[in-house]
């Protein structure tokens, strides 16, 4: 295990302590967050000299749950005072580049993909990372049965969460005899063992060399040889699915596995209910634990898999065809790495691309070295240890919303906070996407010029929501004359953002995340997610639509003569989609936040911008009444992430500050005439404000799509 991770004692310079349960913990005062023009990564300082020369900042202490050492504030007596106190604290969390950073955590299993990819490619994991990953996973272990769920907040275990978390802990040094792993192993065997994990887990277990490739349903790269006009071409699939599939199909076609070591040999004996050499892996290709079979595959998919394995591969798959397909997907991998500066679309594609590059270019290839340099951008330190973010950060998204919140709280009129807004504007200006990617048709990338990404321009994927909110925030700041902005975003670039949004609307009136819907809804027949759904089609989302419509409405008020007819038509169709998406009970489902409270806030704000309020709009009234019906006895709102799965409102056990704030804003945007529900919500928020103006992290607020 030496080439994968150095010993904790040597690589953390003896600063590891033991918690009461015997687990190791690093010295949190030695962690630093690097801000490289917006790119984020955590570093552990090993020497005392580094610690002295590089003092820990307020924002680092905040993320780590340490005392920020900021002065206590007088307890707020009014909502305005509470907002001013929050503004005072929040401004201290701004990073040098002008952004705000935060965790973006949800699915637990993605951590395993990154760790396994690093392990099999001899990419050293810093010892401090290993210590904190172990802490994080044990903190997420389900108390009831000893397993892990697929989501970081899951209270029920799954096969994919259990097998992959178990594997990570073993790779990072936890012994098989640890009582917590004994419980997890027992549960995994009750699920049927690793042979009954979803296909995505099996794929990574094969890469690790602890499962045979016969157990994995095929990821045929030949799909990419079909013409783009083919309705089932991967170019028509949802962006994340086709991007992940590309590198995964290359690895599958090569049937590559890690050579193995003592740990992987032990895992072969631990993950299964019978001796490894006696397992009929081919017979378990479609085996799946019932707890993970949330979205059963259609019979058509099962038939295609059988025909591929039983007929096509043994009788018709010629080496020349396989090599041609491998060349095709390799070209796409190279282009993806180039266009994202080896960051990748997500940690899933990042991990698979690293393995593909390792296979193609060798352990010291330039592509492998580049992937190693950017690997750390996905890891995030929390109070409970080190997690893996869903992306390389949410810098643009958080900064855009931070600007709107600060302006609403009066930051622009307070000289103390004006420099904060100026820095935020500079960050947004720096990370607007100024050109399309090269050969965008060849690599199936949607035009992005003028848009904004989720994280940074280096990763470079334009997102409709971020473009909408980035445009609104930039215009809002540039409309404040006394800020004295020296580098304004030219009107031409603001128009580019408008063009970007106009180019994204689907025929439904709605907006997707990255691009227009390219394929037929019938692609849903090819769903293969098993434990997650809606992975094949580019769907419209309420929150993407509201962001686009709100931005276009705001732009047209400042520039009424630019593309007036097109903007009017687009916003009218978008408003129609928002109303059509409202459920019979008045709620809106939000996929990228939790969930009905999240979408309700955006929907009611957008309707209000269009002149539709509680007094004038049935949709607004129904939306407000839906949210009011969910208010808890303490005056707050709390919604569980389970709403995402069940597509109905699921109450959290406790009120949540963030969701209470969302609903209060929604009601105020809508002009709801009753003051008391809003007052009760604000009192709940104020009651949980801490002495320095901050609030503690509660349940996760971010969504994970249709999982």
Swiss-Prot record:
Keywords annotated in UniProt: Isomerase, Repeat
Biased composition (Polar residues): 1-20
Any one of the GO BP annotations: ergosterol biosynthetic process
Pfam families, per the entry: SQHop_cyclase_C, SQHop_cyclase_N
Region (Disordered): 1-22
Site feature location: Transition state stabilizer: 397, 454, 592
Enzyme nomenclature, EC number: 5.4.99.-
PFTB repeat segments: 130-173, 494-535, 571-608, 620-661
Superkingdom of source: Eukaryota
Keyword ATP-binding tagged: no
Gene3D superfamilies referenced in this protein's UniProt entry, alphabetically: 1.50.10.20, 6.20.120.20
Phenotype of gene-disrupted mutants: Abolishes the production of arthripenoids but leads to the accumulation of a new compound that possesses a sesquiterpenoid chain with adiol group at C12' and C13' position.
SUPFAM superfamilies, sorted: Terpenoid cyclases/Protein prenyltransferases
Recorded metabolic or biological pathway in which this protein acts: Secondary metabolite biosynthesis; terpenoid biosynthesis
Annotated GO CC locations: lipid droplet
GO molecular function: lanosterol synthase activity
PANTHER family in the cross-refs: TERPENE CYCLASE/MUTASE FAMILY MEMBER, TERPENE CYCLASE_MUTASE FAMILY MEMBER
Role, per record: Terpene cyclase/mutase; part of the gene cluster that mediates the biosynthesis of the meroterpenoids arthripenoids. The pathway begins with the HR-PKS atnH that catalyzes two chain-extension steps to form a reduced triketide, which then primes the SAT domain in the NR-PKS atnG to initiate three more cycles of extension to give a linear hexaketide corresponding to the polyketide part of arthripenoids.
Family: Belongs to the terpene cyclase/mutase family.
Protein name, UniProt field: Terpene cyclase/mutase atnI
Organism encoding this protein: Arthrinium sp
Recorded name of the encoding gene: atnI
């Amino acid at each position: 295990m030496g080439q994968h991770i150095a010993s904790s004692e040597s690589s953390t310079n003896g600063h590891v302590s033991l918690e009461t349960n015997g687990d190791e913990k690093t010295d949190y005062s030695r962690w630093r967050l690097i801000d490289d023009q917006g790119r984020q990564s955590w570093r552990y300082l090993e020497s005392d000299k580094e610690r002295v020369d590089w003092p820990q900042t307020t924002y680092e202490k905040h993320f780590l749950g340490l005392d920020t050492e900021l002065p206590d504030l007088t307890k707020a007596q009014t909502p305005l005072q509470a907002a001013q106190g929050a503004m005072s604290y929040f401004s201290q969390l701004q990073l040098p580049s002008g952004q705000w950073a935060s965790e973006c955590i949800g699915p637990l299993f993605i951590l395993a993909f990154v760790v396994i990819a690093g392990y099999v490619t001899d990419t050293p994991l810093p010892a401090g990372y290993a210590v904190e990953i172990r802490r994080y996973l044990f903190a997420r272990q389900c108390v009831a049965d000893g397993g892990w769920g697929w989501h970081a907040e899951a209270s029920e275990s799954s096969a994919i969460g259990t097998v992959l978390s178990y594997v990570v802990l073993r790779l990072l040094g936890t012994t098989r005899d640890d009582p917590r792993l004994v419980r997890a192993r027992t549960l995994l065997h009750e699920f049927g063992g690793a042979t009954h994990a979803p296909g995505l887990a099996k794929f990574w277990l094969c890469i690790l060399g602890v499962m045979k490739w016969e157990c994995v349903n095929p990821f045929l790269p030949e799909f990419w040889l079909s013409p783009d006009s083919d309705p089932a071409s991967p170019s028509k699939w949802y962006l994340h699915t086709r991007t992940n599939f590309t590198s995964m199909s290359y690895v599958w076609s090569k049937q590559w596995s890690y050579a193995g070591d003592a740990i992987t040999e032990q895992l072969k004996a631990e993950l299964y209910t019978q001796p490894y050499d006696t397992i009929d892996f081919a017979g378990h290709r479609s085996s799946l634990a019932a707890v993970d079979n949330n979205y059963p595959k259609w019979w058509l998919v099962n038939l295609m898999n059988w025909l591929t394995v039983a007929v096509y591969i043994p009788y018709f798959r010629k080496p020349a065809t396989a090599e041609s397909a491998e060349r095709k997907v390799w070209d796409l991998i190279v282009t993806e790495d180039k266009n994202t500066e080896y960051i990748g679309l997500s940690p899933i594609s990042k991990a698979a691309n690293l393995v593909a590059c390792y296979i193609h270019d060798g352990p010291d290839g330039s592509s492998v070295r580049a992937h190693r340099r950017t690997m750390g951008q996905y890891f995030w330190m929390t109070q409970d240890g080190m997690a893996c973010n869903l992306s390389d950060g949410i810098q643009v998204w958080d900064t855009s919303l931070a600007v709107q919140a600060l302006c609403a709280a009066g930051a622009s009129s307070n000289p103390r906070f004006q420099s904060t807004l100026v820095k935020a504007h500079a960050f947004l200006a720096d990370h607007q996407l100024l050109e399309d990617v090269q050969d965008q048709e060849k690599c199936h990338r949607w035009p992005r010029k003028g848009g904004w990404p989720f994280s940074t321009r280096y990763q470079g994927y334009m997102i409709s929501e971020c473009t909408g909110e980035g445009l609104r925030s930039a215009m809002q700041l540039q409309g404040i004359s006394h800020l004295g902005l020296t580098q304004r975003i030219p009107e031409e670039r603001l128009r580019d953002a408008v063009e970007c949004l106009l180019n994204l609307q689907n025929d439904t009136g709605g907006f997707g995340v990255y691009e227009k819907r390219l394929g037929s809804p019938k692609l849903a027949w090819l769903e293969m997610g098993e434990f997650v759904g809606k992975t094949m089609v580019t769907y419209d989302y309420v929150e993407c639509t509201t962001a686009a419509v709100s931005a276009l409405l705001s732009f047209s008020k400042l520039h009424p003569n630019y593309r007036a007819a097109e903007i009017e038509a687009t916003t009218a169709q978008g408003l129609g989609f928002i109303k059509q998406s409202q459920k019979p009970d008045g709620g809106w489902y939000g996929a990228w936040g939790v969930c009905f409270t999240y979408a309700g806030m955006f929907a009611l704000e957008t309707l209000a911008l269009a002149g539709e309020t509680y007094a004038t709009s049935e949709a607004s009234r129904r939306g407000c009444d839906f949210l009011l019906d969910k208010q808890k006895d303490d005056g707050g709102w709390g919604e569980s992430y389970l709403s995402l799965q069940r597509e109905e409102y699921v109450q959290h056990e406790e009120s949540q500050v963030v969701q209470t704030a969302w609903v209060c804003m929604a009601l105020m945007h809508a002009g709801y005439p009753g003051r008391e529900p809003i007052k009760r919500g604000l009192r709940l928020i104020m009651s949980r404000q801490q002495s320095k103006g901050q609030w503690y992290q509660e349940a996760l607020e971010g969504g994970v799509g249709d999982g």
